Swiss-Prot record:
Its main location: cytoplasm. GO terms for molecular function: 2-isopropylmalate synthase activity; acetyl-CoA C-acetyltransferase activity; manganese ion binding. This is 2-isopropylmalate synthase. HAMAP family: LeuA_type1. The keyword Transferase applies. Homodimer. The gene is leuA. Its cofactor is Mn(2+). It catalyses: 3-methyl-2-oxobutanoate + acetyl-CoA + H2O = (2S)-2-isopropylmalate + CoA + H(+). NCBIfam families: leuA_bact (TIGR00973), PRK00915.1-3 (NF002086).
Length: 541
């Protein structure tokens, strides 16, 4: 349980609130991959999901709790409404974690009470107290959120928080659910809580905010100045609607402006002690991983991690930066994991140089993964003169994200043009070693390839997302393809990278189908959940 008030606690909700971004659905393996990277990044708490929302969410939270929530690792958190069924599901899913937290919430604004909950203030007070106490029977660490706190009556909010803390809440989280407040208002709200909740010193004050007015990060910084010590944020700021407060922006604000923020933590301005536990050199890699797995591209002018964040086009700026970086840059690109000395590899580079560079970039791979990635590297080197760090990241990320190779693409060939019908031929090796060839006609080359693959694999599915991103500049750049298919309500994703977009598209599609086929082979394991568990629930905090 985290009780420190002398630093900022980073609570990452990429896997819960971030995944509620339209089109950002992740499967269990992808969530686990991100959770592992968040642990390396140094986040204090990972909100791994909403266990009662679906069987898939339950499985993901349980697996992350078991594999990432080890001794010395982050606290693993599960979201739950203030109902016994929700809290019971969260408690069961979190059981394997060394440090577990249940995060339970109920709305407190008058508009939510009247139209959503249809309950009185007295009823909400009773429910909050009772359900926090129930959550304490599963874990010692309980977080309580009054949903839509930003629009709640302050006096009622103080009462709810006092009751929740008295019932055992160790963290009270103040959400600006609809991104409505301004920094001055949000800072005042936190200050009011510090001054008017009698037992507030028994809990950590946390904040959660959305970016509907573009003020989430500014609101959080003001909240910290007024006593908040936990910040709920997401990588790249992904989340519902306009997103959440961006982890990388908050962390680097405390890193760059440490002298300004130190006094608010009772430190002398010149103190060099970091204000967070984040290893900032993992920020860029984490951003790229989340972008790749969710298929949500980072806008070029995004603060900290955007492609243009350290770019200078103005001649005056370029001249200044060349003479001294501090003239126009307030932080070192290396501090977030970007390197100035990009080592360029080529077809004459050997396995040792390849492996050494991967280690320098922070990748920890098994011998088998290195061998597979090296084969991809040599294949790429025959097509591309210079291979950059970004290319290497793409190769490795595509390799480590691959499922068991049940179906293997041996050949893909397409014919298309403005006066011909797109046609594709594929040769696929099946799980029993047989090579099958088929062809199909489509509305475009990718459609034709997918139809040909479907004829061989013969697993019913709906393609729900297809996205392509260029890794580097240039006509010979690698293209990363992310696709998602749906089968019986479940979503399966595939990723691939290649200088040939058609090949990458075929490999990504087959990757998703391999995941789907593997699940069909082993069957979906049944989980002991409450009988009335729904297929899907949308969280509101």
């Amino acid at each position: 349980m985290i009780t420190s008030q002398d630093r900022v606690i980073i609570f990452d909700t990429t896997l819960r609130d971030g995944e509620q971004s339209p089109g950002a659905t992740l499967n269990i393996d992808e969530k686990l991959t991100i959770a592992r990277q968040l642990s390396l990044l140094g986040v204090d708490v990972i909100e791994a999901g909403f266990p009662y929302a679906s069987i898939g969410d339950f499985e993901a939270v349980q697996k992350i709790a078991e594999i990432v929530g080890v001794e010395g690792g982050p606290t693993i958190c599960g979201l739950a409404r203030t109902t016994r069924a929700d809290i019971e599901a969260a408690g069961k899913a979190l059981k394997p974690a060394a440090k577990a937290r249940i995060h339970t919430f109920i709305a407190t604004s008058d508009i939510h009470l009247a139209y959503k909950l249809k309950k009185t203030r007295a009823e909400v007070l009773e429910i909050a107290s009772e359900m926090v106490a129930y959550a304490k029977t599963f874990v010692d660490d309980v977080e309580f959120s009054p949903e839509d706190a930003g629009r709640s009556d302050p006096e009622f909010l103080y009462q709810v928080l006092e009751k929740a803390i008295a019932a055992g809440a160790t963290t009270v989280n103040i959400p600006d659910t609809v991104g409505y407040t301004t920094p001055a208002e949000f800072g005042g709200l936190i200050r009011g809580i510090k001054e008017n909740v009698p037992n507030i010193d028994q809990a950590i004050i946390s904040v959660h905010g959305h970016n509907d007015l573009g003020l989430a990060v500014a609101n959080f910084l003001e909240a910290v100045k007024n006593g908040a010590r936990q910040l709920e944020c997401t990588i790249n700021g992904i989340g519902e609607r306009a997103g959440n407060a961006a982890l990388e922006e908050l962390v680097m604000a405390f890193h760059v402006r440490r002298q300004y923020f130190n006094p608010f933590f009772g430190r002398p301005p010149e103190s060099e002690t970091p204000l967070t536990n984040i290893n900032t050199r993992h920020i860029y890699k984490t951003s790229r991983l989340v972008s790749s797995l969710t298929g949500m591209f980072v806008q070029p002018n995004k603060a900290i991690v955007g492609a243009n964040a350290f770019a200078h086009e103005s001649g005056i700026h370029q001249d200044g930066v060349l003479k001294n970086k501090l003239t126009y840059e307030i932080m070192d690109a290396q501090s977030i994991g970007l390197t100035d000395n990009q080592i360029v590899l080529g077809k004459l580079s050997g396995r040792h140089a390849f492996q050494s560079r991967l280690q320098e970039l922070g990748f920890k791979l098994s011998d088998e993964e290195i061998n597979k990635a090296f084969i991809k590297f040599k294949d790429l080197a025959d097509k591309k003169k210079e291979i950059t760090d970004w290319d290497l990241e793409s190769i490795v990320n595509a390799e480590i994200q691959q499922p068991p190779e049940l179906f293997r693409l041996e050949l893909v060939q397409v014919s298309c043009g403005d006066r011909s019908r797109p046609t594709a031929t594929v040769i696929i090796r099946t799980p029993n070693g047989e090579e099958l060839t088929d062809a199909a006609i489509g509305t475009g080359p990718v459609d034709a390839v997918y139809k040909a693959i479907n004829r061989v694999v013969n697993v019913e599915n709906d393609l729900v997302e297809f996205s392509v991103q260029s890794v580097t500049a240039g006509i010979d750049a690698i293209g990363e393809v992310t696709i998602r298919v749906r089968h019986e309500g479940r979503v399966y994703s595939g990723h691939a990278a290649n200088t040939d977009i058609i090949v990458a598209s075929a490999e990504a599609y087959l990757s998703a189908l391999n995941r789907l086929y593997a699940v069909l082979q082993r069957g979906v394991e049944k989980i002991n959940l409450p009988k009335d568990q729904p297929t899907e629930v949308v969280a509101g905090s």
